């Protein structure tokens, strides 16, 4: 019996051990802000849940709420740009795109003390010329893989259900801090996915976790493990 126990102990050392499951990760992103009291409520909810998100801020909205842009950055969220005027880059000349990006960068710098790290083109619209411009501006382009169209669907239950149905490890979730229903849905989604073991990362963190290099002038929409 003693020899048998010793043999089993030796086998236990030699056999491969199971590894703890890697955390499932997603990135929550918000476009078109800041938006006054709605963004304040969202930031309060994110802080209470220990979640950092990525905000793609519009320059003209930073003009209205510079203190909120500063708060977003100060609380550890990632700040990308959504352009200055929310005009579609594909309908603009190269010079116009350059001016728009420059203005958006200047406004974010003035409000937060830091330059944008990422770009989400308005409407998600881009072409080869736009990618060339973003490369010159040193901005990777970030799209999304889950879109509940919360800017159009003002129903927190429907928005929440859509996201929970489609979210998977590596998803980049598109939302807007423009309506009460969107903010409500975002906080519900966090609660539900955290209960399922998901971890919320910024876009840059999610890309790094997946081993993806964010490249200026290149567009990415998700970062599966």
Language-model region placement:
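Positively charged n-region of N-terminal signal peptides that target proteins for export
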Residues: 1-4
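Cleavable N-terminal signal peptides
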Residues: 7, 17-19
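Hydrophobic core
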Residues: 9-13
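Active-site beta->alpha N-cap acidic-glycine motif
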Residues: 19-92, 96-110, 116, 192, ...
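Structural recognition of the beta-strand scaffold that forms the well-ordered cores
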Residues: 26-29, 53-57, 78-81, 117-121, ...
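Active-site beta-loop-alpha junctions enriched in small/polar residues
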Residues: 33, 58-60, 84, 122-124, ...
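Alpha-helical scaffold elements lining the catalytic groove of polysaccharide deacetylases
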Residues: 38-41, 87-115, 123-169, 182-188
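C-terminal domain-boundary segment and adjacent tail
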Residues: 48-49, 63, 181-225
């Amino acid at each position: 019996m003693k020899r048998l126990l010793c043999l089993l102990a030796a086998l236990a050392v030699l056999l491969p051990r199971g590894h703890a499951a890697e955390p499932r990760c997603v990135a929550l992103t918000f476009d078109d802000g800041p938006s006054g009291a709605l963004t304040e409520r969202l930031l309060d909810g994110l802080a209470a849940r220990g979640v950092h998100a990525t905000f793609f801020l519009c320059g003209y909205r930073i003009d209205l709420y510079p203190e909120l842009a500063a708060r977003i950055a100060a609380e550890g969220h990632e700040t990308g740009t959504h352009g200055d005027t929310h005009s579609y880059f594909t309908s603009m000349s190269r010079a116009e795109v350059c001016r728009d990006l420059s203005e958006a960068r200047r406004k974010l710098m003035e409000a937060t003390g830091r330059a944008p790290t990422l770009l989400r083109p308005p409407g998600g619209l881009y072409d080869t010329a736009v990618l060339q411009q973003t490369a010159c501006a040193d901005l990777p382009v970030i799209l999304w893989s889950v879109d509940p169209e919360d800017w159009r669907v003002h129903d927190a239950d429907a928005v929440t259900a859509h996201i929970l149905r489609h979210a998977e490890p590596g998803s980049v979730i598109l939302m807007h801090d423009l309506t009460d229903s969107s903010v409500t849905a975002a906080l519900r989604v966090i609660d539900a996915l955290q209960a399922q073991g998901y971890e919320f990362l910024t876009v840059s963190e999610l890309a790094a976790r997946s081993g993806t290099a964010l490249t200026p002038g290149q567009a990415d929409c998700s970062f599966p493990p």
